[in-house]
């Protein structure tokens, strides 16, 4: 639930659903924002078989979240999601996390900071580690929606990306998270 909840908070300015999830989530988890698949919006909405079982975010807000991702990616995620891209999984939006945030470095690093500072073990997918944008060339070659988020980096591309300020800041955040003893302690927070 964390990936779409953070997007919802960034896009809407509301942290209510995120705060609720923080209060009920497990402490012994691997935290992720991106994987080889898309962004699982089903995790925060109503039960698909019984709409009376409400989710963390009201369904109209989930719909707005999906449309905001489509707008932020200039329609790339729409091209890669659902039947349009040989993808029958309609409960996720196929996009890199960075592209879902309109390639906004500040928003990307803010969401990563929340991920890293929550209890658990943060995992960063290799495309996320490069703050990678949607791979439309690969999508066009394969017509597999999830391939938008599966760029094959050459050694040269890795070297170039490691010089980008957003990737350097992400690596610094990783080092901070992994070396500070406070992250081995007990978690608490207070909402202002």
Where in this protein do the model-derived segments appear?
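Active-site and adjacent substrate-binding regions of carbohydrate-active enzymes
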Residues: 1-192
């Amino acid at each position: 639930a964390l990936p779409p909840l953070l997007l919802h908070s960034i896009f809407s300015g509301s942290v209510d659903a995120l705060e609720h999830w923080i209060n009920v989530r497990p402490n012994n988890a691997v935290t992720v924002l991106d994987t080889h698949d898309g962004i699982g919006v089903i995790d925060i909405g109503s039960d698909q078989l019984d709409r009376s079982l409400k989710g963390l975010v009201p369904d109209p807000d989930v719909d707005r979240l999906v449309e905001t991702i489509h707008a932020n990616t200039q329609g790339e995620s729409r091209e890669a999601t659902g039947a349009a891209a040989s993808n029958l999984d309609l409960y996720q939006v196929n996009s890199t996390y960075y592209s879902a945030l309109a390639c906004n470095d500040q928003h990307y690093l803010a969401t990563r900071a929340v991920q890293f500072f929550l209890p658990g073990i943060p995992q960063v997918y290799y495309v996320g580690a490069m703050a990678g944008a949607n791979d439309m060339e690969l999508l066009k070659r394969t017509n597999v929606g999830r391939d938008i988020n599966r760029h094959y980096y050459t050694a040269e591309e890795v070297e170039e990306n490691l010089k980008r300020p957003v990737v350097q800041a992400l690596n610094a955040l990783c080092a901070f998270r992994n070396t500070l003893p406070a992250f081995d302690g007990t978690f608490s927070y207070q909402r202002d």
